[in-house]
Amino acid sequence: MSAPIDLQATFIPNDGEFFRVKLALEIAIDEVVNEPGCIRYELTEATEEKLVLTERWESEEALEKHSKGIAVQDLNESLSALLA
């Protein structure tokens, strides 16, 4: 059995896009927390200009499956024009 995988992703929205980025991430979180192998998928407002997503996955395989999933594809599409 492999060790859990921990990740942090930092999101810096374009000017005026903070709340749209936060909403897109919150929508994704609602889907991702129920994915197999997801231990933690939590959003934090690090500053008024930066959001941090903290993830923990049971295994490399679970993370890889998540990375190819529809929730990540939808999130990437939603964020494509909103990030600095």
Predicted regions and their residues:
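Short, surface-exposed ligand-recognition loops at beta-strand->loop->(often short) alpha-helix junctions
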Residues: 10-22
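Basic/polar N-terminal segments that are highly enriched at the extreme N-terminus
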Residues: 1-2
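Noncatalytic linker/hinge segments flanking ATPase motor cores
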Residues: 17, 47-54, 80-84
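Hydrophobic aliphatic residue packing
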Residues: 5, 21, 29-32
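Short, well-ordered beta-strand segments in beta-rich or mixed alpha/beta enzyme
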Residues: 5-11, 39-67
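An amphipathic, aromatic/His-enriched active-site/gating alpha helix that lines ligand/cofactor pockets
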Residues: 27, 31-39, 56-84
